[in-house]
Regions:
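Short glycine/serine/threonine/alanine-rich loop segments
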Residues: 31, 66, 95, 123, ...
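Conserved, mostly hydrophobic/aromatic
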Residues: 22, 61, 88, 100, ...
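Structural beta-sheet core signal
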Residues: 35-37, 71, 99, 159
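Glycine-rich nucleotide/cofactor/substrate-binding loop typically near the N-terminus or early
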Residues: 32-33, 37-44
Length: 187
């Protein structure tokens, strides 16, 4: 389960109290809690002050017993901010890390090298919509298959964005795509 607040802006870090309650509830169901680490909506280019806030949020959530984090950071050129990400990954060590949909802002031509970096630096999974909100479903499905190949069993690809009960099986039919993400996906 990914836990976040403010879905209207793409998700932000939930409060300490919400994280604590979710971790307690999840234990009853043997469910994992992955907490969004994002100090605000908008772009994914963070100041040093925002990175400090993100590090403090990771520390607090870790102390509450979460299983991992969903996070991301980009440069103003929409490339991975590897310096910021290394800092966040170090703070997240030994827990699962999902690169969230900030990835979708990276130009398609640069995505293979970004995936390589994520694999080399211990990221667990990549959450992506495999296109824009306007991208046709067939094109997204094709792109997911390409991303699964690029991940080469070293990074889980997590399909997200517009997935619902009505279409989830089309995504899960892609070889190597075993997870879907959404607010309207119920099994």
């Amino acid at each position: 389960m990914e836990l976040c607040d403010n879905l209207a802006v793409g998700g932000t870090t939930p409060s300490y109290g919400v994280i604590k309650a979710a971790v307690g509830l999840a234990k009853d169901y043997q469910a994992k809690v992955i907490v969004m680490i994002r100090p605000r909506g908008g772009d994914f280019v963070y100041s040093q002050q925002e990175l400090a806030i993100m590090l403090e949020d990771i520390k607090c959530a870790r102390e509450l017993g979460v299983d991992g984090f969903a996070l991301g950071a980009l440069t103003s050129e929409n490339q991975l901010d590897t310096e910021a990400l290394k800092t966040l990954l170090d703070a997240s060590r030994d827990l699962e890390v999902t690169m969230h949909m900030a990835f979708d802002q990276i130009p398609k031509a640069a995505q293979p090298s970004a995936i390589h970096w994520l694999k080399e630096n211990g990221v667990t999974r990549l959450l992506t919509r495999a296109g824009t909100p306007e991208t046709a479903l067939d094109s997204r499905l094709k792109r997911y298959a390409e991303l699964v190949q690029l991940a080469d069993d070293q990074l889980d690809i997590l399909a997200g964005g517009g997935i619902s009960v009505a279409n989830r099986d089309q995504f899960l039919a892609i070889a190597g795509l075993e997870q879907v993400h959404g607010t309207r996906v119920v099994f």
